[in-house]
Design a protein with these regions (language model features):
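Short amphipathic alpha-helical surface micro-motifs
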Residues: 16-20, 26, 53-57, 86-88, ...
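Flexible, low-complexity linkers/stalks enriched in Thr/Pro that connect modular domains
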Residues: 28-30, 106-111, 183-187, 267-269
Length: 269
């Protein structure tokens, strides 16, 4: 009888101990954080790289959860350093919401500073900041459209002209500056010359096709194709070998019964 009681007590203790051990190992917290691994300390990508491109060569794993590579997120990307490199930081979370972050260098294969865009003629019968703000934007080879980053400072209006000083920067921290002249002309033109671009960037030594830049000639809401051959381009002192800004004027010749005028700017870099 006594042996049975001892055996029963022993089995009870074993069961209790086993239960406690089971609960401990089943319910214990995962105190280990995930690990992020890179196949190289620097990634080189094109300027308009996607998130998928930026995640190439990055893996993550966790002792409890296994492979977490598909859960990696891009946490932040710094501005350029002095060598035009950025620091890209990644983060990953395990199922217990423990996180790990790691960083590596980012280098672009081809990067160009932000460029401004102008969507309408720089010669207008309306001289308002609302009109100017809607016309001027900017693009970044990294960020795409950065119209919201453009800052415009106006100078003193004189002789029907207003200087515009433009500044813009993208996420790399690179700033671009440009000075334009916005002209006021209250002439009642009977038609409109529409251009493909009103701000044309070209490298020194190269030439822009100013004729091909003509999109259409409109009279009211109708396009007059025949008037395309009557557009006259005044290039002024345009010199493709000398960096600078050059005003280009498009108008209709005297052989038509219509009048029109618009202005574009060529930026020789």
């Amino acid at each position: 009888m006594k042996h049975k009681q001892v055996l029963s007590l022993f089995l009870t203790l074993v069961l209790i101990g086993g239960y406690i051990a089971f609960q401990y190992y089943y319910n214990k917290d995962d105190n280990t954080a995930p690990v992020i691994t890179f196949d190289s300390d620097m990634i080189k990508v094109k300027a308009d790289a996607s998130d998928e491109d930026l995640l190439e060569g990055v893996t993550a794993s966790d002792q409890e959860d296994g492979d977490l590579t598909d859960d990696i997120l891009i946490d932040s990307i710094s501005a350029f350093n002095s060598e035009e490199e950025r620091t890209i930081t990644y983060v990953v979370f395990d199922k217990d919401n423990k996180s790990t972050s790691a960083s590596r260098k980012l280098k672009y294969k081809k990067y160009t500073a932000p460029k401004f865009t102008v969507s309408d003629s720089l010669l207008q019968s309306s001289l308002t900041m609302t009109k100017i703000n809607t016309m001027i934007g900017a693009t970044s080879s990294v960020d795409g459209n950065i119209d919201g980053n453009v800052e415009i400072k106006t100078g003193t209006y004189e002789d029907h002209k207003m200087p515009l000083d433009l500044t813009v920067s993208d996420s790399t921290g690179t700033e671009s500056h440009l000075s334009l002249i916005y002209e006021y002309d209250n002439t009642s033109y009977t038609s409109d010359i529409v251009l493909k671009k009103y701000l044309i960037y070209v490298k020194a030594g190269k030439e822009a096709d100013l004729e091909d830049n003509i999109d259409s000639v409109m009279v009211g809401n109708s396009e007059y194709v025949d008037l395309m051959d009557h557009v006259v381009i005044k290039r002024g002192d345009l010199d493709y070998d000398v960096p600078g800004l050059y005003d280009i004027y498009y108008s209709l010749d005297d052989e038509t019964n219509f009048t029109a005028k618009c202005k574009a700017v060529v930026v020789v870099q």
